[in-house]
Amino acid sequence: MFAAENGLKGDPRLEAISAAIRVVPNFPKKGIMFQDITTLLLDHKAFKHTIDIFVDRYKDMQISVVAGVEARGFLFGPSIALAIGAKFIPLRKPGKLPGKVISESYELEYGHDRLEMHVGAVEPRERVIIIDDLVATGGTLSAAMSLLESQGAEVVECACVIGLPEVKGQHKLKGKPLYVLVEPSGLDEFC
């Protein structure tokens, strides 16, 4: 569900967030319209709006864990976790975490990948939100959900800054809610 459809329609913060995201055509390869959130991070007001909207949504939901998907979920997750009094768990690509880890494989358009987390990072029945910068197919979020749920955690919702208008990945989330702040910008200009 898009934030504008959930009580924030017309909220100027959403426009500021959208305007702060740079679109880079043909990156990392031809035909891709890359949504560059590094420019959002350079705009301290838009970045604060992003965190504030997520915090407002989750502060009264008894969330005990914010899980961030590597790498850009790491940019938003810790700030949200601190503000709502939750711990932050990084969900990493293979070989990035020392010590004992558990993993979940998922399919990409061309190939496979895995997410890993430390054994014991999440406890059974802990309430979790998963944060990433963008959702397209939903494969990464689905793998993150499976990884956390395999340890007995309750995934309450997945949250992303950017989501495709026809969020194709929603069906991969097993009925879990998906909360998205803005649609990709600049697609009409380059298509």
UniProtKB/Swiss-Prot annotation:
Q: Name one GO cellular component term.
A: cytoplasm
- EC identifiers of the protein: 2.4.2.7
Subcellular localization: Cytoplasm
Q: What happens when the gene is disrupted?
A: No visible phenotype under normal growth conditions.
User: What reactions does this protein catalyze?
Assistant: AMP + diphosphate = 5-phospho-alpha-D-ribose 1-diphosphate + adenine
Q: Which InterPro entries match?
A: Ade_phspho_trans, Adenine_PRTase, PRibTrfase_dom, PRTase-like
Enzyme class comes to transferase
Task: List, in alphabetical order, the Gene Ontology terms for molecular function in this entry.
Answer: adenine phosphoribosyltransferase activity
Respond yes or no to whether keyword Cytoplasm is given for this record. yes
- Which UniProt key words apply to this protein? Cytoplasm, Glycosyltransferase, Purine salvage, Transferase
One Pfam entry for this protein is Pribosyltran
> Which pathway does the record list?
Purine metabolism; AMP biosynthesis via salvage pathway; AMP from adenine: step 1/1
Q: Name one GO biological process term.
A: AMP salvage
Q: Main site of residence?
A: cytoplasm
Family to which this protein belongs: Belongs to the purine/pyrimidine phosphoribosyltransferase family.
Q: Which PANTHER family match?
A: ADENINE PHOSPHORIBOSYLTRANSFERASE (PTHR11776), ADENINE PHOSPHORIBOSYLTRANSFERASE 5 (PTHR11776:SF22)
Q: What does this protein do?
A: Catalyzes a salvage reaction resulting in the formation of AMP, that is energically less costly than de novo synthesis. May contribute to the recycling of adenine into adenylate nucleotides and the inactivation of cytokinins by phosphoribosylation. Possesses low activity toward adenine, but can efficiently convert cytokinins from free bases (active form) to the corresponding nucleotides (inactive form).
Name listed for the protein in its UniProt record: Adenine phosphoribosyltransferase 5
Q: Which organism is it from?
A: Arabidopsis thaliana (Mouse-ear cress)
Gene, per the UniProt record: APT5
